[in-house]
């Protein structure tokens, strides 16, 4: 069987058959490699005393020499103590050797439990000095009991030494250590000697429970340059002369300088070096109870007795003291602070009937008083903890049965802590039974239900009461008039929050009354709502009504219909979203952060006007890349012609998108296509035509519209002005397309004519000299592949005529085609 303790020594020595130098000298109790590494991680091989050791110290000098005891939890379940002493010169004559003796506690949370500092100057620590003594030092079984230097008696005598005033330092140290235990900055204590450090650490440790003291990592001797704020060591003692060199991020306190005491709820303590330390009830109680040796000594025993009555794990450092103070007349001046700590930090699972349970019960009962107002005051004032939970329960128990409280407050107030997902405390379950008495009337029952639902209480009796005792009475208009908006929404939430997405338990008249409680929230508010809060419930009621009326009758609640289908996970959502064009805000609201299913956004992308919401929808479609039809349409809505050309999408994407655009336009009624989409797609078609890439044939219908064609040309003219579309090439292509005989396989006459219009506008901006004529003719010859003289003469004639008659009506294209339909 593995023993509780394991030991290891580490030093610089030279043994027969080994290489000299720093190494593990000896281990005991079957240490595993993992345990050995944990122990070695805390070993210090440098020990710089303030005063150098004599070359040949006497036994008395060795006994009085500084030593370092460090403690920490290690690994997941272990604790370790590192005892380090100067060891003189090693076997090579090198001075400055150190001897480290490490003790590993494998079960530190098992009785008997001692404060780690009680092992200070324990006789089992090996303290060899000199190479010979180091070589002979051998481990023995650790004693069952710790040392006798740091005890309850010693720390009380130390704190209340009449020759040295230490209490102010103690009070500041208590609060600084409490903060460190709670994740605050580590504390550095400047001391005259390591022995003083041990008594300070002992005093702190005995003023908290053994389990909490086991979480306080410390060292009795370090130098300032060895400190690290992030090492995990909460309390470090250094020589007084090192205090000025303590690194930033640590709270430095000197035992030799006066600490200015603060006040609980007011000014903080301040050290001589200017460090501010927030005052806590722990030090406030200590200022009352640690004044007399007799009472202080009894207090330490009481702290341990309290800790034995509960599971001593994770206790707040001040809680055992508070429990010891509560109810004792001699400590009456600390009772308020004690009650505050007990209410905030009492642990769960205290044995029923124990003295601790009776004390806690008495404190909590006093905190909530006797009335609903008293309990409400406690809810507001008590910090989060068991006391607050008790106050919350007591308040709700009283509020739901207090007609006067329910009548005077609207809405009934609630504290910051709710009961969502928690079991109903037995006292509250009993109070709910009384509060839901049908004889109280529908208005009062609705108030009670509203309060309970808002508090997060889940009790089937609430819905039963509403369905059986409230809903039948709501046909009376006078009864409805007395029901406030909050109660109406609570009723709606309870009736719907039963897996009935269609609200079958609510008739049409009641549903209209509930849905009209408030307007549909704007999308930004609904996006932040949580299920069954006020905003969410309003939308749910309107969504249920819209679903009942159908898409055609939803009216202004069409968005609520779509949102409700999505919120309830309806299988109809994708079909409904895909079948119609929606306000982009409504579609975005319905889908939230989830991916858009299938082609749900296609009709909206084609039929909606340009808007910021549509831009967000299109960007979401492109980012998710979940449906090719939707992505192709989203590209039309978000990408400008300039970007389409600059990024070469006309080369890389347009070939793939053209059949998708044609497919969409073949199933969407032309009357449903928004002009903003038509114009953008027509501009892409012209880009394809002028760059020799495919374009959607369905655009011919858009090109027949003077307005759409003109807007598409306006989108492309900046590309010509910037030189991204060469003017000579635009004119050349426009003339060639206008003069070409009709192709029965591709009757894109209107698109060709639109290209001719663009060519005419470009020509209007030309100088019209021989350079322009020659440039356009050269491009025409290159594109047609015919550079014979007759062809060149014909091209020159066409260009010259265009430049000569710029701005004439009808256009050259119309004359070449014999006219066109407007």
Swiss-Prot record:
Domain of life (superkingdom): Bacteria
InterPro entries hit by this protein: GAP1-M, GAP1-N2
Disruption phenotype: Loss of DNA conjugation when disrupted in recipient strain, no effect when disrupted in donor strain. The recipient strain secretes reduced amounts of EsxB. Disruption of the probable saeA-saeB-saeC operon completely blocks polar localization of EccCb1.
A Pfam match: GAP1-N2
Other facts: DNA conjugation in M.smegmatis is unidirectional with distinct donor and recipient strains; mc(2)155 is a donor strain while MKD8 is a recipient strain. Mutations in a donor strain that alter DNA transfer do not always alter DNA transfer in a recipient strain.
Function: May be involved in assembly of the ESX-1 / type VII specialized secretion system (T7SS), which exports several proteins including EsxA and EsxB. Involved in DNA conjugation in recipient (MDK8) but not donor (mc(2)155) strain.
Name this protein carries in UniProt: Putative ESX-1 scaffolding and assembly protein SaeB
Native source organism of the sequence: Mycolicibacterium smegmatis (strain ATCC 700084 / mc(2)155) (Mycobacterium smegmatis)
